């Protein structure tokens, strides 16, 4: 079932009971299939909303990340036109506030777009959590640092940053297992008729119905409406965690991501982060559009000093 805003806003089920929480669920009732491509600027721009959904309503859903191959599936024609991709990235960054530096397509263009997708499946062989962390590190290196993430040395750096087992990752990178897993994702993309990325398909695991498909980027309220429609109740959002806990969990986050999660203006977010920077809790990572912030892990610093 495709997303229809009129249908969603017509739902009148409510549930304001404080008892309506994750404790009632042995299994989370909703599964979200998130179709992405590591080279897609809009997929990167979806990150603030995924984080906010996870913070407020993560007790209701699990995320299954699917590599769609929309950009990576050997689409040679597109990758012979770096100026076109540069323009897309620049427009996306200005529109969404999530920095993606299109200069990479002039300075260090991606040679083999298929490889990063294969690397994600290799990382996922170490677990779903490892796979998600690896995707994030790919995106940070690509969109912020302008690294060519089709190069093996950059992939190994990403694997290190994601705390993967490097020997296992190297062994799996071009393995038949990783290739088979990627083919399964591409097949699922076709079967679900996903022709645009990012796309999220929401499924209620307790009801045999078609999923609700949302293709593209929408305001956060739309994703909340979908959850309400599928749950047939109005879920109560969880409280946002203390900012330092949020930063410690995600390690590297953008000003835009923090502002979305905490419902702050960009100016207020900058002021709060500068306070933490002054306290040496975070360090600023300058970007072409806005800033990112890296949590300073004191325990690692102390361990290194003791060695």
Curated annotation (Swiss-Prot):
Belongs to the SpxH family. Adapter protein required for efficient degradation of Spx by ClpXP under non-stress conditions. Interaction with Spx stabilizes Spx and exposes the C-terminus of Spx for recognition and proteolysis by ClpXP. This is ClpXP adapter protein SpxH. Disulfide bonds: none annotated. It is found in: Cytoplasm. Transmembrane segments: none annotated. Interacts with Spx. PANTHER family: CLPXP ADAPTER PROTEIN SPXH, GLUTATHIONE S-TRANSFERASE KAPPA. The keyword Translocase does not apply. Gene3D superfamilies: Glutaredoxin, putative protein disulfide isomerase domain. GO terms for cellular component: cytoplasm. InterPro entries: Adapter_SpxH, Thioredoxin-like_sf. HAMAP family: Adapter_SpxH (MF_02245). The keyword Signal does not apply. Its main location: cytoplasm.
């Amino acid at each position: 079932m495709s997303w229809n805003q009129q249908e969603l806003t017509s739902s009148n089920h409510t549930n304001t009971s404080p008892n309506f929480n994750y404790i009632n669920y042995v299994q989370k009732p909703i599964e979200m299939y998130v179709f992405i491509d590591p080279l897609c600027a809009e997929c990167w721009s979806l990150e603030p909303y995924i984080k906010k959904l996870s913070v407020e309503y993560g007790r209701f859903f699990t995320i299954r990340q699917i590599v769609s191959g929309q950009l990576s599936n050997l689409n040679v024609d597109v990758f012979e036109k770096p100026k076109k991709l540069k323009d897309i990235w620049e427009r996306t960054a200005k529109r969404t506030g999530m920095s993606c530096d299109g200069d990479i397509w002039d300075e260090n263009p991606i040679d083999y777009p298929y490889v990063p997708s294969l690397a994600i499946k290799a990382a996922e062989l170490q677990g779903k959590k490892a796979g998600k962390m690896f995707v994030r590190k790919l995106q940070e290196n690509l969109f912020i640092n302008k690294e060519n993430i089709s190069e093996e040395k950059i992939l190994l750096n990403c694997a290190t940053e994601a705390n993967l087992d490097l020997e296992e990752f190297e062994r799996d990178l071009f393995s038949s297992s990783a290739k088979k897993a990627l083919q399964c994702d591409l097949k699922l993309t076709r079967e679900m008729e996903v022709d645009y990325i990012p796309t999220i398909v929401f499924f209620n695991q307790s009801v045999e119905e078609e999923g609700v498909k949302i293709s593209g980027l929408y305001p956060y309220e739309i994703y909340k409406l979908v959850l309400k429609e599928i749950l047939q109740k109005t879920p109560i959002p969880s409280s946002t965690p203390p900012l330092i806990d949020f930063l410690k969990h995600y390690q590297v986050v953008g000003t835009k991501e923090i502002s979305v999660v905490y419902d702050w203006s960009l100016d207020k977010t900058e002021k709060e982060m500068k306070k933490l920077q002054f306290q040496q809790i975070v360090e600023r990572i300058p970007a072409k559009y806005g800033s990112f912030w890296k949590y300073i892990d004191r325990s690692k610093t102390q361990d290194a000093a003791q060695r």
